[in-house]
Amino acid sequence: MKRIAVLTSGGDAPGMNAAIRAVVRKAISEGMEVYGINRGYAGMVDGDIFPLGSKEVGDKISRGGTFLYSARYPEFAQLEGQLAGIEQLKKHGIEGVVVIGGDGSYHGAMRLTEHGFPAVGIPGTIDNDIAGTDYTIGFDTAVNTAVEAIDKLRDTSSSHGRTFVVEVMGRNAGDIALWAGIASGADQIIVPEEEFDIEKVASTIQYDFEHKGKNHHIIVLAEGVMSGEAFAQKLKEAGDKSDLRVTNLGHILRGGSPTARDRVIASWMGSHAVELLKEGKGGLAVGIHNEELVESPILGTAEEGALFSLTEEGQIIVNNPHKARLDFAALNRSLSQ
């Protein structure tokens, strides 16, 4: 394989630029040419494809977002869009593609593979909800950003004796809420993976104020449960009498310079994706499991609720993607007593 392309798709995540940089520089070191695709699958179909060299990725490792831009392009789910994209790739002499993004991006990569065009996926999303990897690019940065914000909210919460509901991104996964909640010493964490009793949440707030000597209360809420405003309304209906405020951290979690960890894992996975394409391997997604690189079938990782990893013998192992999350939920309960 002499010429490959790289794209970012779906929601942006800190560390994507580090992954692009690794793909470009690793490929060049292997004697391959690299092309960038602007705006994900939309740019692929439109032919927004151009050469990338070491100079173009210089000084990008510390930048958040993605300099290749990103876009959601539902038309690629249709056969017409897929064939149009492949036609553009062949027109530019491209033989394989590295796709950086979330599960929607992986579905696109899976379609390319089904049409016989080699594609390798790299998990890039702050949500950390991609099967086949313990961590996704951008997750660590998002958690650190959330912790910094919650620490500041605690300052004002304690100054005024208030309860704060802090809503964080994560789509249908509670990873950001759990990690940020534990790291910031949240009093309660509400995530989609665990059922909750709103009356118990309200009574816990009251008990903390009346019997534990606390003058403030922090609840970290994953957006996959409900909005912060809706949760606050339910709290009031359940009898909460505290001075309640809601803060939605929103898209701020997607921005900022990536952490050292995100830069390292992005570089590691980007380099390995090139190695796979050089070997002519497509239809795989790169991930990290137990601090080691792993490869998973894109077909498995793109299916919600499945978690696949490969042994050295090539056997597929199915694991439980929510075990660590539930362990963390139990951990926070024990620490917030």
From Swiss-Prot:
Cell location: Cytoplasm
Role summary: Catalyzes the phosphorylation of D-fructose 6-phosphate to fructose 1,6-bisphosphate by ATP, the first committing step of glycolysis.
Keyword ATP-binding: yes
Reactions it catalyzes: beta-D-fructose 6-phosphate + ATP = beta-D-fructose 1,6-bisphosphate + ADP + H(+)
Annotated catalytic residues: D127
Pathway participation: Carbohydrate degradation; glycolysis; D-glyceraldehyde 3-phosphate and glycerone phosphate from D-glucose: step 3/4
Molecular functions (GO terms): 6-phosphofructokinase activity; AMP binding; ATP binding; fructose-6-phosphate binding; identical protein binding; metal ion binding; monosaccharide binding
Gene Ontology cellular component list: 6-phosphofructokinase complex
Similarity section: Belongs to the phosphofructokinase type A (PFKA) family. ATP-dependent PFK group I subfamily. Prokaryotic clade 'B1' sub-subfamily.
Binding-site residues, substrate: T125, I126, D127, R162, M169, G170, R171, E223, R245, H251, I252, L253, R254
Positions with a binding annotation for Mg(2+): D103
Cofactors demanded by this protein: Mg(2+)
Keyword terms: Allosteric enzyme, ATP-binding, Cytoplasm, Glycolysis, Kinase, Magnesium, Metal-binding, Nucleotide-binding, Transferase
Residues in coiled coil: none
Lineage: Bacteria, Bacillati, Bacillota, Bacilli, Lactobacillales
Complex and partners: Homotetramer.
EC number(s) recorded for this UniProt protein: 2.7.1.11
Residues annotated for ADP binding in this entry: R21, A22, V23, V24, R25, R154, G185, A186, D187, K212, K214, N215, H216
Residues where ATP binds: G11, R72, Y73, G102, D103, G104, S105
Activation and inhibition: Allosterically activated by ADP and other diphosphonucleosides, and allosterically inhibited by phosphoenolpyruvate.
Highest taxon of the lineage: Bacteria
NCBIfam families xref list: PFKA_ATP, PRK03202.1
InterPro entries named among the record's database cross-references: ATP_PFK, ATP_PFK_prok-type, PFKA_ATP_prok, Phosphofructokinase_CS, Phosphofructokinase_dom, PKF_sf
Name of the protein described by the UniProt record: ATP-dependent 6-phosphofructokinase
